[in-house]
Amino acid sequence: MKKIRILSLFIFTTILTSGTFGQDLKVNSNGLDIYYRIMGKGLPILIIGGGPGDVSDRYLSLCELLSKDFQCILVDQRGTGKSTPAQIDSSSISLALTIEDFEAIRNHLGFKQWTVLGFSYGGFVAAVYTNDYPTSVSSLIHMGSLGFDFNVYRHFSDNIVSRLHPGDLELLKYWSDSTRMATDKHHAIVETIKARMPGYFFSREKALLVTQTMKDSDFNLSLGDYLWDDMYKRSLELLKKNSDFDKPVLILHGRQDPLGESVAQSLSRYYKNSKLVFVEKSGHYSWIEQPEKILAAIKAFLSPTK
């Protein structure tokens, strides 16, 4: 039994760290080179990762999973990774520019339409993209999406902290100390993210494995300064009425996601043609905890009607 457990953990670690990363490609969008990678063949799926500020490497495992059956396009969003401008300010970082970057990639690749998958914060970005460029999107997938009501952050954070063990809370307190924040704020904040990570997951073992792969360079924490106000304004616009987007929408949500079920249910009501799937025994990072279920759900969603 112990050998089986060790083997399963090895396989899971391989999912997080291995694979063909794809060739670095780029397109110029509004004066900035936006870098992206393509993995797999078939129906194109744009992956919009979370954050704001996550580098695309954090979602390689998702892209690798989908590349078994689809063509996955993974982007270093504006301000992250290789797509970082010389100067980060309101002139170089905005939600509108980020959306235009996606359009630049789609046009460069010659896709009339593509499926858009947004995770967490990326789900909000995907909703804005779909609203602004509905003819560019053939279908939409929300995965652990934040939705549009930012009040969820209150219980999201509470739910995460409520799941932490005493050792996690000690680490959180240690790295939240003002002295450590003053010494190296970026590193300290990343360590607090790592300390909170078990609260995002159903499986503590998998959460701890994820923390082992996390690096300071995985995050550009300054992007929120230039995006949150914009996001709030766009969320109010989106909430004024239900979406006019009438193409298929899949909402994948971990049953144990600390966001709670109401976010996914609200999204399901928001779209005319939506399907809501709760992923059992899964927290926020559903493709890491239940990869087979996620791939099966997406394959069923994107398969042509027979």
Regions found by a protein language model. Name each.
Residues S274-K306:
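Catalytic active-site module of serine/aspartate enzymes centered on a nucleophile-bearing elbow/loop
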Residues F245, I251-H253:
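Short beta-strand/loop motif that positions the catalytic acidic residue
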Residues L32-P85:
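Conserved HGGG/HGGXW glycine-rich cap/lid loop of the alpha/beta-hydrolase fold
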Residues Q77-F119:
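Active-site loop/oxyanion-hole signature of alpha/beta-hydrolase fold enzymes
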Residues T179-D225:
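Conserved alpha/beta-hydrolase catalytic His-Asp/Glu region
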Residues P258-V263:
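Conserved alpha/beta-hydrolase "acid-adjacent" motif
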Residues L140-S178:
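Flexible "cap/lid" loop of the alpha/beta hydrolase fold
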Residues K112-H155:
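Conserved hydrolase catalytic core segment
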